[in-house]
Design a protein with these regions (language model features):
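Eukaryote-biased RCC1-like beta-propeller repeat architecture
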Residues: 1-179
Length: 179
């Protein structure tokens, strides 16, 4: 039904709500935005979490010591859930995929581009588009799969690197979709 439930340790507010003893043994509902939006995808990072709502906005909560909440500030998300924003303060919209890699987060957008924020991008606390990365179909960790089957690694310098694939008997490089 699109409800996000969390429980466990809450030392960095990663549960998305306040707890009395820094933990919750019982699952409790996480409220996404003022309208309690339903989630379509979730991703867990290192003591922080992300969720894509039905509106295609991305919500984040938890530890923010490396800008991994992407909400434009350096504060931990104490109790609230915030939306991921661009540098100009507008919400990231059009999200169709999310992924985390340590304290860095990646958002796949409907137009085939990827937005990134967090530790591997100089602790950047807002989303920016990875330059040179287009026609992406899926993100996982800090890797991206293109529609043509190429695998790209996203790295600290904001320049994606093509990961070499397998070769056929004639030495021709095969895309991941042809393996």
């Amino acid at each position: 039904d699109g409800t996000v439930w969390t429980w466990g340790l809450n030392d960095s507010n990663q549960l998305g709500y306040e707890t009395e003893n820094g933990m919750s043994l019982e699952p409790k509902k996480v409220t996404l935005g003022a309208n309690n939006e339903q989630a379509v995808l979730i991703a867990a990072g290192d003591k922080y979490n992300l969720a894509i709502g039905m509106s295609s906005k991305v919500y984040s909560w938890g530890n923010n010591n490396n800008g991994q909440l992407g909400n434009g500030n350096d504060d931990r998300s104490a109790t609230g859930i915030d939306t991921v924003k661009y540098k100009d303060g507008t919400d990231v919209e059009g999200a169709v995929g999310i992924s985390t890699h340590g304290n860095t987060a990646y958002i796949l957008l409907a137009n085939g581009t990827v937005a990134v924020f967090g530790e591997e991008y100089d602790n950047q606390n807002y989303a920016s588009i990875v330059s040179g990365l287009n026609n992406i179909l899926q993100v996982s960790g800090n890797y991206a799969l293109s529609i043509s089957g190429e695998v790209w690694k996203m790295s600290k310098d904001n320049i994606p690197t093509k990961v070499m694939g397998y070769k056929d008997d004639n030495g021709n490089e095969l895309s991941i979709l042809k393996i």
